[in-house]
Amino acid sequence: MKCYFLILFVCLISCTNRNNENSPEKIAIQKVIVIQPLGNFESEQANKVLSEIRIVNPNVVLRGVIPFPGNSYYKPRNRYRADSIIKSLKNNIGKDSVIVGLSHSDISTTKNGIKDWGVMGLGYRPGKACVVSDFRLSVKNKNEQFYKLVLHELGHTAGLPHCKVKSCLMRDAEGGNPLNEEIGFCENCNKFLKSKGWQLK
């Protein structure tokens, strides 16, 4: 009889543990998002980004504008190295935060064997920092495109790769600007970000 109750008790504990694995408590709490304007980036536009991000994460703060890191300027092309910016930014936040740099100036990185490739944004997967620039965005719908770009790079820092769904915000730009064709995160990317604490529909 004692053996029977012992087996029953072990089974109950096992079932409870399996249920807890999928409980809401297991869902990650989203990190604090720090918005960092760079160079001559206007506070008005930075505040617009702040308001938009609060929709998906209320834990967001806006810092005052700072100069670009001195070692990030690439004189031959008169632009800033995104990888150098990220390296500098990630050293100025806590372990439970992720920082996004905002730029009007052109930014670049090394890609496909090209030493200095101009980009709209850069974020490592996963990572603590990313940077975006509106330099290459269309004049029409620039604010909307810029916000989509911010979400794209923050998606990378959360761990998302590029997505093959053409309407997904995680689509690879492939040297172009498909932002007007992107309407939101696809089902799979949405599910992943929700597991990271993002407040998406």
Task: Tell me the role of every PLM-derived stretch.
Residues 1-8:
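Sec-dependent signal peptide recognition
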Residues 12-14:
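C-terminal motif of bacterial Sec signal peptides marking the signal peptidase cleavage site
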Residues 16-18:
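Bacterial signal peptide processing site
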Residues 20-28:
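Short boundary motifs at domain starts and secondary-structure transition points
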Residues 29-41:
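Fold-level signature of zinc-dependent metallopeptidase catalytic domains
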Residues 39, 117-145, 161-201:
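Metalloprotease/metallohydrolase-associated module, dominated by Zn2+-dependent proteases
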Residues 43-149, 157, 161:
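Metzincin-family zinc-dependent endopeptidase catalytic domain
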